[in-house]
Amino acid sequence: MSSKDQLKRAVCETIDRHADTIIDLGETILRHPETGFNEVKTAALVADQMRALGLAPRTGLALTGVKGRLAGGAPGPRLAFIGELDSLRTSEHPLADPVTGAAHSCGHNAQIAGMLGAAIGLTKAGIAGHLAGDIVFFAVPAEEFIDVEERAARVAKGEIEFMLGKPELVAKGHFDDIDMSMMIHTGSRDAAEARAFLAKSSNGALVKRIRFLGRAAHAGSLPQLGVNALNAAMIAMNAISAQRETFWEKDTIRIHPIITKGGDAVSVVPAEVTMETFVRGGSLEAIVDANKKVDRCLRAGAMAIGAEVEIHTIPGYLPQRNDERLGQIFGANVETLFGPGQFHIGGHRTGSTDMGDLAHLMPVIHPYVVAAEGKAHGADWRINEPRHGYLTPAKLLAMTAIDLLHGDAAPAKEILAQFNPAMTKEAYLEFQRSLFRTERFAYIEEEARRPKIG
C-alpha cells in the first residue's frame, strides 16, 4: 500500500495537471450566478462533471442539489466534501447578472471548483482503493438566506419545508448516509494574514419577516385620517437600536433590519410596510433572548402609532462549532503546502452559515483559504489569486481525506467515536419546526377620529 505522503503527492500533481479545467470551472460559475434554490445551470454543470468522472450523481435534491459518491477500497466512514451552489444579490458588482442582480460576492464559485477539483484529483490519481470509506461530493443549494418572500412562497406551495439548503437536505434524508463533512470557503486578506484559517465558532440566527399595517390617506391634505405604517416601523427600528446596550458582549448579538417596502406613493400615508431582519447570536439561548426583545420592539412600534404588526419568525442558522481534531488535520496539510505559520486558528466569527446546523449532528469543519480581496458580500469582492483560490481548496480537501481514510481510517473513526452530537436528527427537526411562528397584534382603531367642524 502506498504511504499517505505518496498519495498526497500524487493527488496534488494530478490537480496541478488539470489546473486549467478547475480554474475554468470556477470562472464559468462566477460569470453565471444564480440565487438559492434557482441554481439550475450551476447544478447541471456540476452533474456533468461528476458524470464524466464516473461518480453517478443524484440530482434535484432539495430542488437543485447534486450528490456523487466515490467508494473506497473497503467499508468505513463516509466523508462529505460540500460546495455551495448559490450566489448573493449584489447588483453593483461588475459581474452581477444584469437581470437578477445576482453575483458571486461571497466566493461560492470557488467552493464548487475546489470540490470538483478534489474529485478530479482523487479519481484520476486512483486514490480510492487505498481508502476505507466513501467520499461524497455534495453540491448544495441556498446557503445565503435571501429572497425571503420568494422562499416563503415555495414553502406555502410545498416545494420546500425549510428556507436554507442544508436544513432542507437534512429533512429529506440526504445527509443520512454521511458521517462527517467539510467544506472550504474563500477568505480575504482582511480576515487573516495566513494562507488559510479556521474560526472556532460562528453565530447562529433567526430570521424575521415583519408587516406593519396602517390606513392609507392623502399625505398632504388629510394625514390625520391615516395610520402611518412606516412610522410604526421606524419606531420599532429605533427601539431595537435602544436595546443594544442590553446585549452581553459574549453573546455577539447582531440585529440588522431592512425595509423591503416603505409605502406605495409619496402622496399616500403608508398603509403597508414590510421589513426583514436577522437576529444573530453566539448561542441558542442568546438568540432566543434577543428575539424576545426584538418582538417587544416590533409590538411597541405598532402600539405607539395605533397600527397592526404581523411577525413571522423563521428558523435560520444554528451556531457553528468546528471540530478541533478535524481542524488540526486540515491545518497540518495547509502547513505542508505553505510552511509553518500559514494556518491560523481564530476565535468566534459573527457571521452565520448552515454548516452550523450540520455541526449539531456530525463533526464538521468550515475553514477559509485566503485568496480574495475586497469586502465579502460587497461589489469589490473578487478572487485575486485564481490558482490559490481554486486549486488549493481542491488539494486540501483531498489531502485531508487521505489523512482521515487511509488504511483502516483510524483517524476518522477516532473523531467519530469522540464526537457527541448536540442533537439527534429527530430532535433537530423538531426544534427547527418549533421556531416557525406567525403572530399578529392589532392596535388600530376602527376609524380614525375626524376633527369637529364649526
List each language-model region with its residue ranges:
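Histidine/acidic-residue-rich, glycine-tolerant segments that coordinate divalent metal ions
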Residues: 93-105, 109-110, 122-256, 263-268, ...
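Short connector loops/turns at beta-strand edges and beta->alpha or beta->beta junctions
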Residues: 84-93, 142-144, 211-216, 274, ...
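Acidic/His- and Gly-rich active-site-bordering loop/insert found
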Residues: 3-105, 109-136, 141
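Short glycine-enriched loops at secondary-structure junctions
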Residues: 83-88, 187, 203-205, 260-263, ...
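Divalent metal-coordination and catalytic microenvironments
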Residues: 29, 68, 81, 108, ...
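Metal-dependent amide/peptide-bond hydrolase catalytic core
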Residues: 2-6, 230-454
